Structure formats: structure tokens, C-alpha cells
Amino acid sequence: MDRVVIIGGGWSGCAAALAARKAGAEVTLVEKTDMLLGLGNVGGIMRNNGRFTAAEENIALGADELFGITDKLSRHVNIDFPGHKHASLYDVIKVEPHVKRLLEEKGINIKTIARAVDVVMDNQKTSNGDKLMKAIILSDDTEIAGDVFVECTGSTGPMGNCLTYGNGCCMCILRCPAFGPRVSITQKAGMNDIMGHRKDGAFGAFSGSGKLEKSSLSDEIQRELNEKGVVVIPLKPEEVSKDKLDLKVCQQYALNEYAQNIVLLDTGYAKIMTPFFPLEKLRRVPGLENARYADPYAGGKGNSIRYLSVAERDDKMRVTGIENLLC
């Protein structure tokens, strides 16, 4: 039985682990924090626009399990918000334990608080000169050997990158101060990563949303969120900042409406569709006088920075130059 090692337990890592297990592999999934899903714990938007087709295609091809969970845990279905139609909003507070139980039931070996920091390379190369990985090394010096490795560590962190290319560590769901920084497996294997650029040439992009404690909002806004799933609050002209639109990772949410309004979505928290919004200014908005950030905790100042480490790969998701590393 082939041994597949997945590094990173976000949505992509969980999907890769599930697919490998269904294909008959012995699968180990390592995640540096104490929870799976990573940024999926603060996501929540599914089936909007073309994602509906993508979801149904995956389900038809036999990859239905994870979509089944998000569908089951959707707080709202078939809702519209600026630029987006027929969206579902899954409950980000409830989703992670359901996914973890599914993977465990499938026989996947899950290791949490297990941060990969280095690799062991094979001295041999393939006939075409590509390198081969033998194992990953965790922060406690444990080695995990495998036949195939899949890097799903994402492109965010460590804290120094958020300081250099953003507004500092804003204490997001990745919790780098507690669980340690992300380490690029492709770089440890001797390959180069690509760094994304913004329009102004700066590296990386800001995560495009935050979370407000729903109970900190007015009763009227809470009621509308619970009933409809979305609240759009117009901003005064002097509060509009279109510059932040170019900072966003997800450019499908970089429409003018997201600068001219506060757009809130009910994902268990109140998902605020802007990279950051100063708390003092936010509390001037009617209904948000007592607003408080839940993620990132410093959402009034900034957000996590992504796209700082992207592996070069082919169309089969194999990392260039390494025979048995996928991404």
C-alpha cells in the first residue's frame, strides 16, 4: 500500500487526504495547529456563482463527502449579495469537528500540533533528473516517511511576512504565535517558490474579510442576519476607501459595492467583507456601535497576508523538479 503524507490540514489538505484514502493509500495528515480546516474555520461561502457548478461536478465525480458536510451545516442557502448569486453559508463554528470525524472514520491518521519544518531527500534521482523526497521532519524531530507527499500548507505566514508585507500579525485563526510559523516544504526540498504581487508591486495580498461577534451588533442587524443571511449597510462618502479593494486575495469580492457598503454575511459570526476596518470608524456605523472583532482579533488594523509562497508545478499538480511532491 502506498504511503501518502499530506502536510497541512486546511480544506485542500483534508480533500487530498480523503481522495488518497479512497484511492487505497495509507494516509497521514499533519496539521501544525490543534484544528483542521485552517482558514476554512473563518470562510463559510459556498456555491456562489460558478462555485455551484464546481461543487456539482465534484459531487458527480464521486467527491461528495465534504460538500455534504458544508451543505448540511449551511445556515443559509440560495442567498444573493453584491456580485454573487445563489450562495450557501456554512456555519464556521460547527464545521471542523464534522470534517475531522469523517476523516477519522475513513481511516486517515491525523496528527495535530505537528508542524513540518524540514524534509529528508533521497540520494537517488529519477531518470529525468528529478529529486525524490523520503520523509518530512516535524518540529519535535519526528520523521514521517512516505512514498508520495502533498504540500497543502497554504501561502500565509510566518508572522514576519505579515509584518513586512502587511500591517503586522493581526492574530488570525492560523495562530502562528502559539503553533509556530508555516514552513515551505518545496523550499526545504531545494526548489523555489513564487511570490504574488499586488497592483502596486508589493508582495502578497490581504485576506479579504474578518469576523465580528454577532452578539455585539444591534438587535435589528442580528435579526436580519439570522433571517436573511446578509446585511448591506451604506457608508458615508467620507468613510469609503476603494484602495482596499486592490489589496484583497479574492478579487471576486473587490467590487465597488464592498467599498461603498459594509457587507455582513451570517456564517455563525458576522462575516465582514473587507480586509480590515478601523474599529473606531466601524463603531460610528448605525447598528455597529458595540462591534467587536472575533477574527482576526486586530481586524481593525489589518489581516493575514497570503500568496507569499506558491510552488511551481505542472498541470497534474506535481511540483517542478520533485517526482513525488504534489501541491
Regions from the PLM with identified roles:
Residues R3-T28:
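N-terminal Rossmann-like FAD-binding beta1-loop-alpha1 element of flavoenzymes
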Residues I7, E151-C152, C327:
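Redox-cofactor binding/interface segments in oxidoreductases and associated redox assembly factors
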Residues A19, A25-E26, E31-R115, P158, ...:
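Conserved N-terminal/central alpha/beta ligand/cofactor-binding core
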Residues R75-V92, A135, F203-G208, N261-G268:
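Helix-loop-beta segment of a Rossmann-like dinucleotide-binding subdomain
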Residues N109-K111, A291, L326:
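General small-molecule cofactor/ligand-binding pocket signal
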Residues I110-Y258:
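Predominantly flavin-linked oxidoreductase catalytic cores and closely associated redox partners
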Residues K214-V240, N256-N303:
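Flavin-binding catalytic cores
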Residues K301-C327:
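FAD-binding beta-loop-beta segment adjacent to the flavin cofactor pocket
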